[in-house]
């Protein structure tokens, strides 16, 4: 059986953020698919609550340094990487001080959503796709987990017109643990 190239675009991955259903799922799914011989790349935002020293994150200079324009402003894209030792799974982190330096993930101390969560999600999605492009790596399957990654399939569909290698091969799926009220 030929292995797939699977891209996981995750809002959270355990153990880097508190154990939520989504964070645990992304970790276990990435690990299980890699153990079955698939080639995977897993991405998540580098939130300010992630201890870079404890988790041994380091910047990947050759992938960092590009600027992404969000709402008419330039924002530097920084790529960091770490491995989950017990799983031998590598995680790529999309980082930017304007969007991800704060200690909370999606809500402030009053439990209100950050006003710029939409911009943060756009930056994350574009950062993932630009990094995959820089890696010269073409996924056959794209898994998007939670709403922070929800725009990735739209970007993929729009970008497929310019990337014939992805047109016939790439399939995407979306999973959300959010409740709608």
Residue map of PLM features:
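Catalytic cores of nucleotide-sugar-dependent glycosyltransferases that transfer UDP/GDP/TDP-activated
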Residues: 1-181
């Amino acid at each position: 059986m030929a292995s797939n190239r699977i891209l996981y675009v995750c809002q959270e991955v355990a153990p880097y953020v508190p154990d939520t259903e989504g964070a645990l799922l992304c970790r276990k799914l990435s690990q299980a698919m890699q153990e079955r011989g698939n080639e995977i790349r897993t991405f998540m935002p580098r939130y300010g609550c992630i201890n870079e020293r404890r988790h041994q994150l380091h910047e990947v200079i050759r992938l960092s340094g590009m600027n992404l324009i969000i709402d008419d402003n330039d924002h530097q894209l920084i790529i960091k990487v770490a491995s989950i030792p017990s799983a031998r799974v590598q995680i790529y982190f999309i980082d930017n001080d304007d969007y991800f330096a704060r200690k909370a993930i999606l809500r402030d101390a009053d439990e209100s959503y950050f006003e710029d969560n939409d911009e943060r999600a756009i930056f994350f999605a574009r950062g993932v796709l630009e990094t995959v492009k820089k890696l010269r790596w073409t996924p056959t399957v794209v898994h998007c987990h939670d709403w922070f990654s929800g725009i990735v399939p739209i970007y993929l569909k729009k970008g497929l017109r310019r990337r014939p290698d992805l047109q016939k091969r790439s399939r995407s799926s979306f999973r959300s643990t959010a409740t709608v009220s």
